[in-house]
Design a protein with these regions (language model features):
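Active-site/acyl-donor-binding loops of N-acyltransferases
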Residues: 143-162, 234-236, 286-335
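Conserved donor-binding loop and adjoining core beta-sheet/short helix segment
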Residues: 21-24, 28-132, 240-268
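A mid-sequence, solvent-exposed acidic-amphipathic segment
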Residues: 209-210, 217-237, 241-242, 247
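Short amphipathic alpha-helix that is part of the acyltransferase structural core
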Residues: 2-50, 57, 63-66, 71, ...
């Protein structure tokens, strides 16, 4: 991801070093200034970092320091993508504090990251930003990054939602029931393995830039049940007998207590077209409404017509799209 990166108008001398845990407050502040509508917290960021499987995948973060007082003024990350894994493919992220932009700091961080990745034999780079970030988009394009994919962000006013208008969509087909992950964990603590298998199967059908790859169960499990964002009572699962056939889950935000985020909604191929996805989404909306949440936010590929259709029908309002950018390093100068 790239956040508010601009080309320099004056040079600034900064020190670049490896990230240390005491840098969390500074990088969270920088990230929240870059994307204030999607703020994170130190706890959330630390959880993401600590649950990333560094035995299987490469992960590294740098910070840029103002040399006179060691203030963190920028950051850069790179890592393998566990759910779209290729040993030569990496996600990259850059952000510079607003007061320190246009001084060449982003360029210094970029050069450091690309140099590292070239030494690791990287050939593909991936990063993301919102279409409103015109400076970041221009910055990426000037460095050879091209647009690969677009995803709508959409938002639903949960409190204004008229559940009565969807009464006919609440009912389930014969033989299908909906339970929560909390209920399933109480019934069988080992249920996560079956849920993971379904999640991986459903992910194969989601439009994406790079082919889906199966990441570690352990990472997925931590995200589902131990993340600061986890809500097992808002993780809805459709069952046909004892078999899982669909899901739709919500996650919370520590900074935005009245906002919930849709994680993933999907139904197995042989059960599609029967209203199960809509019924799952309605349970999620009902949860948000009954818990006093103001808004639900979600993201969908612009190519995912079926899910976009459901969201439009429910009343989700499209926001500016998020763009995936990529760069091929195969012919990049390695000198």
């Amino acid at each position: 991801m790239a956040g508010f990166i601009q080309d320099k108008v004056q040079q600034s001398h900064v020190e670049i070093r490896d990230f240390e845990p005491e840098d969390y407050p500074a990088i969270v502040e920088i990230e929240n200034l870059a994307y204030p509508e999607h703020p994170t917290t130190v706890e959330e960021r630390r959880f993401e970092d600590e649950t990333f499987d560094r035995k299987r995948y490469v992960w590294r973060r740098y910070v840029a320091l103002e040399p006179s007082n060691d203030t963190v003024v920028g950051e850069a990350d790179y890592n393998h993508l566990p759910w779209a894994y290729d040993p030569a493919r990496f996600g990259i992220w850059f952000a510079v504090h607003p007061q320190w932009r246009r001084r060449g700091i982003g360029s210094r961080l970029y050069e450091k990251v690309v140099g590292d990745l070239q030494s690791r034999g990287a050939t593909q780079l991936r990063t993301w930003t919102q279409e409103t970030q015109s400076d970041a988009i221009g910055w990426l394009r000037r460095r050879g990054h091209g647009e690969l994919h677009r995803a709508w962000e959409s938002r639903l006013d949960a409190q204004a939602f008229d559940m009565g208008a969807f009464r006919g969509h609440w009912d389930l087909p014969a033989g299908i029931k909906i339970v929560t992950l909390a209920e399933e964990l109480a019934r069988d603590p080992e249920c996560l393995k079956e849920l993971f298998e379904m999640d991986c199967e459903l992910a194969l059908d989601v439009p994406r830039v790079d082919p889906f790859t199966r990441g570690p169960f352990e990472m997925w499990r931590e995200w589902v049940i131990n993340s600061p964002r986890s809500l097992p009572d808002a993780f809805f699962i459709a069952k046909a007998g004892d078999r899982y056939v669909g899901q739709s889950d919500l996650g919370s935000s520590e900074q935005l207590s009245d906002v919930l985020y849709t994680g993933f909604t999907g139904v197995r191929r042989e059960y599609r077209g029967r209203g199960i996805a809509m019924a799952l989404k309605l349970r999620a909306v009902d949860y948000a409404k009954s818990h006093g949440c103001r808004e639900i936010r979600t993201w969908n590929s612009t190519l995912n017509a079926p899910m976009l259709g459901i969201n439009v029908k429910l009343g989700f309002v499209k926001q500016p799209v998020w763009i995936t950018f990529g760069k091929d390093l195969t012919h990049e100068d390695r000198s």
